[in-house]
A protein has these predicted regions:
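N-terminal phosphate/diphosphate-binding loop that engages ATP/GTP or pyrophosphate donors
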Residues: 2-49
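Phosphate-binding/switch loop-helix module in NTP-utilizing enzymes
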Residues: 45-113, 119
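Conserved beta-strand scaffold positions in the cores of enzyme catalytic domains, especially
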Residues: 8-10, 100, 152-154
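Alpha-helix C-cap/termination motif
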Residues: 3-4, 92-93, 124
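Residue-level preference for the first positions of well-ordered beta-strands
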Residues: 8-9, 96-98, 128-130
């Protein structure tokens, strides 16, 4: 992210070690994570059996993180990067705003407001979004795969090194997406 001057805003999730095994959502603003551990951002638990998500927390805190990320990206687009969206190439030295969604998966399954907010952001061509999505069994991946403008990378142990090498060789982030997207 530093190479391309990406300034992600959005969220990351972090699983705590046992015995708690709680999962917390942490807001990211302009590339800086704001770590806090409260019931207000505890989005689930991961016992040894099946993960359990807390839909009301995703619907409140998760949506708030995404709305603030969108505001941050819009502010960046309106100052300095005016008019730049997914279809245009950013200068390498320009700060490039990105919405970050770390690990969309099973825990969000019942969070309808969160799901609709994520899908609305996915479908907006003004934004670059970097997200990790579970490969199967979630509602997010089928939505992404139906969007012609989405570049979905199925990162595996077999292709990870080559994708990282392509990212290193690219002149800028949009060029990387264009190059790799043609091969998908």
């Amino acid at each position: 992210m530093q190479k391309y001057a990406l300034q992600p805003s959005g969220f990351i999730t972090k699983r705590e070690a046992p015995p708690e095994s709680a999962v917390y959502m942490h807001q990211v603003v302009a590339g800086t994570a704001r770590y806090r551990y409260t019931t207000g951002n505890k989005v689930g638990i991961c016992p040894q059996q099946k993960p359990v998500g807390f839909a009301p927390i995703f619907d409140m805190y998760g949506v708030m993180c995404l709305k603030q990320a969108e505001e941050s990206v819009l502010a960046s687009l309106n100052s300095g990067c005016s008019g730049m969206g997914r279809t245009e190439t950013a200068p390498q030295q320009a700060s490039f705003p990105v919405i970050l969604m770390d690990e969309l998966g099973f825990m969000e399954a019942e969070a309808e407001h969160f799901f609709r907010t994520v899908c609305a952001l996915f479908s907006n061509p003004r934004y670059y979004i970097i997200g990790t999505v579970k490969p199967r069994g979630t509602r997010f991946l089928p939505v992404l795969e139906q969007m012609p403008e989405a570049a979905v990378f199925h990162l595996t142990l077999q292709n990870r090194d080559e994708l990282y090498a392509q990212l290193e060789r690219a002149q800028n982030f949009p060029a990387f997406l264009h190059t790799v997207g043609e091969r998908q």
